From Swiss-Prot:
Organism: Pyrobaculum aerophilum (strain ATCC 51768 / DSM 7523 / JCM 9630 / CIP 104966 / NBRC 100827 / IM2)
Protein name, per record: Translation initiation factor 6
Pfam families reported in the protein's UniProt record: eIF-6
Role of this protein: Binds to the 50S ribosomal subunit and prevents its association with the 30S ribosomal subunit to form the 70S initiation complex.
Origin: domain of life: Archaea
Family that this chain belongs to: Belongs to the eIF-6 family.
Name of the gene: eif6
NCBIfam families in UniProt: eIF-6, PRK04046.1-1
Keyword line: Initiation factor, Protein biosynthesis
UniProt cross-references to InterPro entries, sorted A to Z: eIF6
GO cellular component, one term: cytosol
Biological process, per Gene Ontology: assembly of large subunit precursor of preribosome; cytosolic ribosome assembly; maturation of 5.8S rRNA; maturation of LSU-rRNA
A molecular-function term among this protein's GO annotations: ribosome binding
Length: 220
């Protein structure tokens, strides 16, 4: 059963900037309420790790996570890296001038779509740490590929700006069903409002009924 639970974090429906997940662990900021732990455990069905990156709660922006590993930006602190490594995942710092790395990488467990903005040396780290084939491309000509889509092992939901050609390419890259959708009443930057794994999705609480139905169809 694929559950979808609407939540707010720090008073905003942009929950994806604060939370990152795979199928084993979900990373949340230290000072979110306990009810978010409950939502994670009941919906995503993972353990919970309360971490920061550069002492910031923006885990969804500053990390890229799949079942194989975790990528962190250069501004992460050494003691924070140690905490991530203690979970037994592959962990490395991606050497790039960009800090909001999740905007530039759309990562599954076998393939990652990477923005052409990301330096070639950084792309190799993506491949090694996440254990994926790296494909460099845009979505609708936009290099912020990680912000415009979310995926799990069943489906990929992408912003409505994506063309038919984009949908076809994404389906070929990731070998899952692909369709367009929005979150939080029409927002195209899906990563900002959706945290998804194979078990379920947490979404911003402004998400409308038709948006929830589309998520269930594509990701469930």
């Amino acid at each position: 059963m694929f559950d979808i639970t609407p939540i707010r974090v720090f008073g905003t429906s942009s929950i994806g900037v604060f939370i990152a997940t795979n199928n084993t662990v979900t990373f949340i900021p230290p000072d979110v309420p306990e009810k978010i732990d409950d939502a994670v455990r009941n919906t995503l069905r993972t353990s919970v790790a309360r971490f920061t990156v550069a002492r910031s709660p923006l885990l969804g922006i500053f990390t890229v996570v799949n079942d194989n590993g975790v990528l962190l930006p250069p501004l992460v602190l050494e003691e924070e890296v140690r905490l991530f490594k203690a979970l037994g995942l592959n962990v490395d710092i991606i050497n790039t001038k960009y800090t909001a790395i999740s905007n530039l990488i759309l990562a599954g467990n076998k393939v990652a779509l990477v923005s052409p903005l990301l330096e070639p040396s950084a792309r190799k780290v993506v491949a090694d740490v996440l254990g994926v084939e790296v494909i460099v491309d845009t979505i609708a000509g936009n290099p912020l590929v990680g912000a415009l889509a979310v995926l799990n092992s069943r489906g990929l939901l992408v912003a409505p700006e994506a063309t038919d050609d984009d949908l076809k390419k994404l389906s070929e890259y990731f070998k899952v069903r692909v369709d367009v959708g929005t979150v939080n009443r029409g927002k195209s930057f899906l990563r900002g409002g959706i945290v998804v794994n194979d078990n379920g999705a947490l979404v911003g609480d402004e998400t409308a009924g038709p948006e929830l139905m589309r998520m269930q169809q594509v990701l469930g």
